[in-house]
């Protein structure tokens, strides 16, 4: 059985960690949203993710932006007009944010002063399935997974 560690070392007394292993979402759909959250306060990140999960606020898509639509307000806020509404990714990150907040509360940290100091998304496994089609062809039905880790710390 393989072991897995966090990709950053932090002070254990002043920080809290959480991870999601094999989240049922593609890497390219969640990595842009995770990149936006780094450096935010936990309460601010929660409000932002709730707006994204309701489909009220788009996020900029810089890396995997092929054939993506332009959205109003993105160019003014992020200096990038291409974006999307990752509702499923926002819901997964909201659950992860709740987990790390609960971990911080158990450790005795002040949850009002928590800031996201590290968030990383790693590619997970791919379940490769094939759907048979006519004339001997087959269509791929791949299910992609991701691993997400988050570290929050109390700011002074």
Curated annotation (Swiss-Prot):
Keyword ATP-binding: no
Key words, A-Z: Ribonucleoprotein, Ribosomal protein, RNA-binding, rRNA-binding
Keyword flag Ribonucleoprotein: yes
Gene3D superfamilies listed in its UniProt record: Ribosomal protein L22/L17
Molecular function GO terms recorded: rRNA binding; structural constituent of ribosome
Cystine pairings recorded for this chain: none
SUPFAM superfamilies: Ribosomal protein L22
Stretches assigned to coiled coil: none
GO process terms (BP): cytoplasmic translation
GO cellular component, one term: cytosolic large ribosomal subunit
InterPro entries assigned to the protein according to its UniProt record, in alphabetical order: Ribosomal_uL22, Ribosomal_uL22_CS, Ribosomal_uL22_euk/arc, Ribosomal_uL22_sf
Subunit (UniProt): Part of the 50S ribosomal subunit.
Family: Belongs to the universal ribosomal protein uL22 family.
Job of this protein: This protein binds specifically to 23S rRNA. It makes multiple contacts with different domains of the 23S rRNA in the assembled 50S subunit and ribosome.
Protein name per the record: Large ribosomal subunit protein uL22
Organism per entry: Hyperthermus butylicus (strain DSM 5456 / JCM 9403 / PLM1-5)
Gene name for this UniProt entry: rpl22
């Amino acid at each position: 059985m393989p072991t897995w560690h966090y990709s950053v070392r932090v002070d254990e007394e002043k920080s809290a960690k959480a991870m999601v292993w094999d989240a049922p979402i593609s890497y390219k759909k969640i990595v842009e949203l995770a990149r936006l959250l780094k450096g935010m306060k936990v309460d601010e990140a929660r409000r932002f993710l709730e707006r994204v999960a309701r489909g009220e606020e788009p996020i900029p898509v810089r890396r995997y932006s092929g054939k993506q639509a332009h959205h109003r307000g993105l160019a003014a806020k992020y200096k990038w007009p291409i974006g999307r509404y990752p509702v499923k990714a926002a819901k997964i990150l909201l659950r992860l944010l709740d987990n790390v907040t609960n971990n911080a509360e158990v450790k005795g940290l002040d949850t009002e002063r928590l800031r996201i100091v590290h968030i990383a998304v790693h590619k997970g496994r791919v379940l490769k399935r094939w759907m048979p089609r006519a004339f001997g062809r087959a269509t791929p039905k791949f299910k992609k997974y991701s691993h997400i880790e988050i570290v929050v710390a109390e700011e002074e």
